[in-house]
Design a protein with these regions (language model features):
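Short gly/ser/thr-rich secondary-structure transition/capping motifs
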Residues: 104-108, 151
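Structural preference for beta-strand elements that scaffold enzyme active sites
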Residues: 5-8, 37, 94-98, 121-124, ...
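Alpha-helical scaffolding segments of alpha/beta enzyme cores, especially the outer helices
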Residues: 25-28, 77-84, 109-113, 118, ...
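Short aromatic-enriched loop/helix-cap "lid" or pocket-rim segments at secondary-structure transitions
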Residues: 51-52, 110, 136-137
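Divalent metal-binding pocket/active-site signature
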Residues: 20, 45, 118, 122-203, ...
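Conserved small/polar residues in nucleotide/adenosyl-binding loops
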Residues: 220
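Basic, nucleic-acid-binding surfaces and adjacent catalytic neighborhoods in DNA/RNA-processing proteins
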Residues: 214-216
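An N-terminally biased module of ancient metal coordination in phosphate/nucleic-acid-related enzymes
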Residues: 2-105, 114, 179, 186-190
Length: 221
């Protein structure tokens, strides 16, 4: 008989710029949902520059305090904080300490060094920045078609995984679609089949996992 183990290995807490939920509260919420394998993977994006966000679909400004903080963590404080929670939940869940690294070829030495600074259990490698801009912001899409913006993202993804090997699993390969104008409207994966195939083949060749990220189900699917 098979035993299904519910797990979540992409979890952000208040150590991440995009979360205000303390680690303990996040762990409790996951356990209450029946998840017993948990890896905290807060963001660390070297070279990331936050800016005011205007919703790409409404053009309304959504500038908040979150937008003014960089996506950086103090690795030692973060590691010790999560490590301290592991014994507390040992009879209810197995908790691991990870990180989500923003991959960039122009900071590859610093990113590789950070990957070695602590004994991480798990590292997600993700592309959040293309030519200095995050597709989350409408500034990324200015002066280019939706197809061009998406292709530039996949080009950057391929360059990142060719250059960097310091991660276990590649995160949210369709991140770009989540923030594209009108999201998945008029989007077909077949339009980008060649480069996506190249990305997937290289990840497999390098022994990397490929994340199944369902974050956009609540708003898109």
């Amino acid at each position: 008989a098979f035993i299904m183990i519910k797990s979540d290995f992409h979890v952000h807490t208040s150590f991440s710029t995009d979360s205000d939920t303390p680690a303990r509260e996040q762990i409790e919420a996951l356990i209450n949902k029946g998840i017993t394998e948990i890896c905290i993977t807060d963001h660390h994006d070297i070279g990331y520059t936050a800016m005011e966000k205007a919703d790409v679909n409404t053009s309304e400004s959504t500038n908040t305090n979150i937008e003014s903080r960089p996506f950086r963590i103090n690795p030692f404080a973060y590691y010790e904080a999560i490590l301290g929670l592991i014994p507390e939940y040992s009879d209810r869940a197995r908790i691991s300490i990870g990180v989500e690294l923003g991959l960039r070829t122009d900071y590859h030495h610093s990113i590789e060094d950070f990957a070695e600074v602590c004994a991480w259990d798990f590292i997600i490698g993700s592309t959040h920045v293309v030519n200095g801009l995050d597709p989350y912001y409408p500034q990324y899409w200015e002066g280019k078609s939706k197809q061009q913006g998406i292709m530039e993202y996949y080009d950057a993804t391929l360059a990142n995984i060719r250059k960097l090997d310091c991660f276990d699993v590649y995160g949210h390969i369709d991140y770009i679609v989540r923030y594209a104008p009108n999201q998945r409207e008029n989007y077909s994966i077949l339009d980008y089949k060649d480069i996506i195939d190249e990305i997937l083949k290289l990840l497999i060749q390098n022994g990397k996992g490929i994340e199944c990220n369902t974050a956009d189900r609540k708003s898109v699917v």
